[in-house]
Amino acid sequence: MEDTVIVGRHAVREAIITGHPINKILIQEGIKKQQINEILKNAKDQKIIVQTVPKSKLDFLANAPHQGVAALIAPYEYADFDQFLKQQKEKEGLSTVLILDGLEDPHNLGSILRTADATGVDGVIIPKRRSVTLTQTVAKASTGAIEHVPVIRVTNLAKTIDELKDNGFWVAGTEANNATDYRNLEADMSLAIVIGSEGQGMSRLVSDKCDFYIKIPMVGHVNSLNASVAASLMMYEVFRKRHDVGEI
C-alpha cells in the first residue's frame, strides 16, 4: 500500500507520539536542529529512519507549507462504527459525535478535527460518497488532532443515524430556518450533531432523520458561516453546557 505524506511539525510530532506507523521522516537541509529537537529525539527513540533532503524535494512531496519536516506514513485508517458504538456504551458520561453531510473541503475537516479534539468530541462520521477523505491536507490542518479523534466512514448516513438513535443518541440537525437557537440546545443526553455542506446544507434523507433542529443566529449581510466555524460553535456550546466554569 502506498505511503501517505504528512507535513508540518505538529502533524509529524503527533504521528510519532501516538505510534502511527512511520516509514521515514524527511528533514530539510539546513534547518536548525533546535527547532525540531523533540521530533528528532522521538524518532531516535522509536528507531525511525530520518533522512536529510533538499528543500525542493519537500516542496515537491508536500505541495504545501511544510516547515522543513515531512513523514512517510502508513495511510490513515478509519474507525469501525460497530466498535465505536461499543466503546460509547462502555464509557462513563455522555457521548458527542459530529456527522458531516457532504463536507468536501479538507481544510474544513482538519479544522473540525482540531476543535473536536479540544472539546472532547468522541468521533466524527463522514459518508463514503460526496465527502472529503483523510488526506495530507486534512492531517496538516488538524495540527495532529487526526491522530486522536476517530473518523468513521459509512456507506449510508441515514441508516447510521438510525443506529445512533437505537444506541441512545439524540440527533440535532443544523438549519437556517424553523430551528431553535443553538444557545438553547439541551446537552444532558448523548448527541449527534449534523453539519451540512456549505452550499447545499443537509440532504433531505438526513434532515428527515433528525430529532430536532438548531440554528446559529446571524445579523450581518452574509447568510451562512464556514462549515468548520459552525461546527466549532456547536461543539463548544455542548462543552459549555456540560462543564462548569473553572472545572477544566
Curated annotation (Swiss-Prot):
GO biological process, one term: RNA processing
Known EC number: 2.1.1.-
Binding site for S-adenosyl-L-methionine: G196, I216, L225
Family matches, as InterPro entries: Alpha/beta_knot_MTases (IPR029028), Ribosomal_eL30-like_sf (IPR029064), rRNA_MeTrfase_TrmH (IPR004441), SpoU_MeTrfase (IPR001537), SpoU_subst-bd (IPR013123), tRNA_m1G_MTases_N (IPR029026)
Sorted UniProt keywords: Methyltransferase, Transferase
MF GO annotations: RNA binding; RNA methyltransferase activity
Family listed: Belongs to the class IV-like SAM-binding methyltransferase superfamily. RNA methyltransferase TrmH family.
Record's protein name: Putative TrmH family tRNA/rRNA methyltransferase
